[in-house]
Each structure stands twice: as structure tokens, then as C-alpha cells.
């Protein structure tokens, strides 16, 4: 501090041409002013540190809030996706079951129709053969009379 005072005394003498002593009231004001400036700077540093801490707290809360909101949105999207996937799977299973049922019904219907046609043809042949046997028997009875 005394170096600053000596430097100030030299500066006042050089600029203004006035000799100032160490006990001059101007230097007392300078000392008081320097002390007030130092105290003010310390208090501003303290306020700045508190403000910085408050900003960090706010940023942390915002980060946590954003994380919580993102997690809620992700969970909602996941639930919606699961529901949509379950619905699509259910619809697809129903469509596949219906397609299989139609194929089985169509396949059985064709096979059954073919079997019925074969049975009808065999029945017609049996009726023709029976008619021929009846006609032959009638001829034998008529010839024997």
C-alpha cells in the first residue's frame, strides 16, 4: 500500500506541480477510497458467487425437469408403440387365421366335390349294371316260358 501512496504522491507532483505529504487529507481520502473499492470488490465477488450458485441450481433443475419430461414422453411413445404393435399383431393373426380357414374350406370343398362326383358316377354305373342284370333276368325268364 505504501508503494501506491508513494507513486500517487509522485504523480500528483508531476501532473499538478504540488507537493503532497503523507499526512495530507487527499491521501487519506485516497486510502479510504481504495479501502471502499476493495470492500466493494469483495462484496461483488461474494454476490457473483451466490448468483453463480443460484444459476447452477436453476440449470440443474431445468436439466432434471427436461430429463423427466423426455422420459415421460419416451414412456408414452413406447406405450403407444406397444399398443399399436399389439393391435397390428392381433389384426394380422386374425387375417392369417381367416385366410387359412378359407384355404381349408376351399380345399375341402374341392376335394369333397370331386368325391361326390366320383360317387355319383359309380352310382350311375351300378344303376346301369343293375338295369342290365334285371333286363338279362327278364330275358331269361321270358325265354324259358
From Swiss-Prot:
Q: Which UniProt keywords apply?
A: Conjugation, Plasmid
Taxonomically, the superkingdom here is Bacteria
| Example GO BP | quorum sensing
Q: Name one Pfam family in it.
A: Activator-TraM
Asked if the record carries the keyword DNA-binding, the reply is no
Membrane-spanning intervals of the chain: none
Give the record's family classification: To plasmid R751 TraM.
Show the NCBIfam families listed in the entry: PRK13895.1
Output this protein's name. Answer: Protein TraM
Give the source species: Escherichia coli
Which gene does this sequence derive from?
traM
Amino acid at each position: 500500500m505504501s508503494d501506491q501512496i508513494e507513486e500517487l504522491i509522485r504523480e500528483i507532483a508531476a501532473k499538478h506541480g504540488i507537493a503532497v505529504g503523507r499526512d495530507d487529507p487527499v491521501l487519506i481520502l485516497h486510502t479510504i477510497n481504495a479501502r471502499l473499492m476493495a470492500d466493494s470488490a469483495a462484496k461483488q465477488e461474494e454476490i457473483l458467487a451466490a448468483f453463480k450458485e443460484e444459476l447452477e441450481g436453476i440449470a440443474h433443475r431445468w436439466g432434471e425437469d427436461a430429463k423427466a419430461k423426455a422420459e415421460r414422453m419416451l414412456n408414452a411413445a413406447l406405450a403407444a408403440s406397444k399398443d399399436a404393435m399389439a393391435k397390428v399383431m392381433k389384426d394380422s393373426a386374425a387375417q392369417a387365421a381367416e385366410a387359412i380357414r378359407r384355404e381349408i374350406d376351399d380345399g375341402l370343398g374341392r376335394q369333397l366335390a370331386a368325391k361326390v362326383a366320383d360317387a355319383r358316377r359309380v352310382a350311375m354305373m351300378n344303376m346301369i349294371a343293375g338295369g342290365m342284370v334285371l333286363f338279362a333276368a327278364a330275358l331269361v325268364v321270358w325265354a324259358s316260358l
